[in-house]
C-alpha cells in the first residue's frame, strides 16, 4: 500500500463492474458467530486482565479458512463481511466491560440508582450502529483519496490476509504454516 501519485486513480481489487457475493446468509451467519465467539473471549480477557484485543486479523484468518474448507469461489466479498461483522465485537465489548461494572458499583453505593440490563444492551447496540453510520461518509475519502497515506497496520494486515486467502495456493500456505507453528507452540507452552 502506497500513496497515490498526483492524478493516479484508485482501482479497487473487487471491480465495481462485476457482481460478487457479499452480504448473504453464509457471510452474515458466520460474521455473527465470530462476533459472539470473540465478544465472549474479549469480555473474559478484558475483565480478567483489563485489556481487550482487536479481533480483526484472527477473524479474517478464520473467514479465509472456513471459505477455503467450504470450497467457496470468489469469497473475498463474503470474507470482508464476515470480518467486518465479527471485528466489531472487541470495540463494543470494551465499551461495555469498562462501564457496566462501574454502574453496578454505583448502584451498590446508591441504591436509589437502578441499572437495567436492557437499557445497557440498547445503548451499546445504538453506540455501535451510530459509529458505523458516522463512519460511512468518510469511507470513500479514506479508501480512495487518502489511499496509502495513513499507516493503519491492522487494516493493512487484515486486507493482506483476505487477499492472500482469495489468491490461495502459494499465497495462503505461509498463513497456514504460521498458524500451525503458533498453535503447536501454544500447545507446548500451555501443556508442559
Predicted regions located by residue number:
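Alpha-helical multipass membrane-protein architecture
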Residues: 1-192
Amino acid at each position: 500500500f502506497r500513496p497515490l501519485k498526483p492524478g493516479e486513480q484508485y482501482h479497487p481489487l473487487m471491480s465495481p463492474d462485476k457482481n460478487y457475493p457479499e452480504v448473504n446468509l453464509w457471510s452474515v451467519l458466520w460474521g455473527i458467530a465470530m462476533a459472539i465467539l470473540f465478544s465472549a473471549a474479549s469480555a473474559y480477557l478484558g475483565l480478567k486482565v483489563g485489556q481487550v484485543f482487536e479481533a480483526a486479523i484472527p477473524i479474517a484468518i478464520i473467514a479465509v479458512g472456513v471459505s477455503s474448507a467450504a470450497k467457496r469461489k470468489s469469497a473475498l466479498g463474503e470474507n470482508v463481511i464476515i470480518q467486518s461483522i465479527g471485528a466489531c465485537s472487541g470495540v463494543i465489548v470494551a465499551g461495555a466491560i469498562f462501564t457496566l461494572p462501574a454502574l453496578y458499583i454505583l448502584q451498590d453505593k446508591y441504591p436509589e440508582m437502578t441499572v437495567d440490563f436492557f437499557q445497557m444492551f440498547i445503548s451499546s447496540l445504538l453506540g455501535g450502529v451510530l459509529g458505523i453510520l458516522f463512519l460511512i461518509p468518510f469511507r470513500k475519502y479514506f479508501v480512495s483519496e487518502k489511499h496509502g497515506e495513513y499507516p493503519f497496520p491492522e487494516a493493512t494486515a487484515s486486507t493482506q490476509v483476505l487477499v492472500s486467502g482469495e489468491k490461495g495456493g502459494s499465497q495462503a500456505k505461509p498463513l497456514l504454516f504460521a498458524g500451525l507453528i503458533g498453535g503447536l507452540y501454544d500447545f507446548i507452552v500451555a501443556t508442559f
